From Swiss-Prot:
Keywords, alphabetical: Ribonucleoprotein, Ribosomal protein, RNA-binding, rRNA-binding
NCBIfam families according to UniProt: rplO_bact
Family in the record: Belongs to the universal ribosomal protein uL15 family.
UniProt name for this protein: Large ribosomal subunit protein uL15
Region (Disordered): 1-50
S-S bonds: none
Organism listed in the record: Listeria innocua serovar 6a (strain ATCC BAA-680 / CLIP 11262)
Gene name tied to this protein: rplO
Described purpose of this protein according to its UniProt entry: Binds to the 23S rRNA.
Presence of keyword rRNA-binding: yes
Pfam families cross-referenced by the UniProt entry: Ribosomal_L27A
Ranges of compositional bias, category Basic and acidic residues: 1-18
A single BP term in Gene Ontology: translation
Subunit details: Part of the 50S ribosomal subunit.
């Protein structure tokens, strides 16, 4: 086999359909858009969720809830992630950002108990779940709310 004999495998390359190039092509004149109407126009088509004038679903369903403007979002750190630190390390928010475990502090850091911890660490965070606090202390570490 030589370079000039190479050909793409059968059916792997499809020629694109050029519309509006004469009636003989099968896609001339109206270019597959039919005659007149909203969908035949440039930029034509109904908006997302439009149901032909019928009251749309999102307006038929009652409103629910509200957005709490004082909501605090915490950066979440699970216990299994803390195993990468050496025994006796003081884990602070600054250290977590520095090591790339979290990107930013948000409204603070919350330690959750997913996974298990084998290291003795002093963990400083804004919040701890009860199970996480228990697990850290069971491993011989300390928790400190900042």
């Amino acid at each position: 086999m030589k370079l000039h004999e190479l050909k793409p495998s059968e059916g792997s390359r499809k020629e694109r359909n050029r519309v509006g190039r004469g009636t003989g092509s099968g896609n001339g004149k109206t270019s597959g858009r039919g005659h007149k109407g909203q969908k035949a126009r440039s930029g034509g088509g109904v908006r997302l969720g439009f149901e032909g004038g019928q009251l749309p679903l999102f307006r038929r369903i009652p409103k629910r809830g509200f957005t709490n403007i004082n909501r605090k979002e915490f950066a979440i750190v699970n216990l299994d992630v803390l195993n990468r630190f050496e025994d006796g390390t003081e884990v602070t928010p600054e250290l977590l950002i520095e090591t790339g475990i979290i990107r930013n502090e948000k409204s603070g850091i919350k330690i959750l108990s997913d996974g298990n911890i084998e290291k003795k660490l002093t963990v400083k965070a804004n919040k701890f779940s009860a199970a996480a606090k228990e697990a850290i202390e069971a491993a011989g570490g300390k928790t400190e709310v900042i």
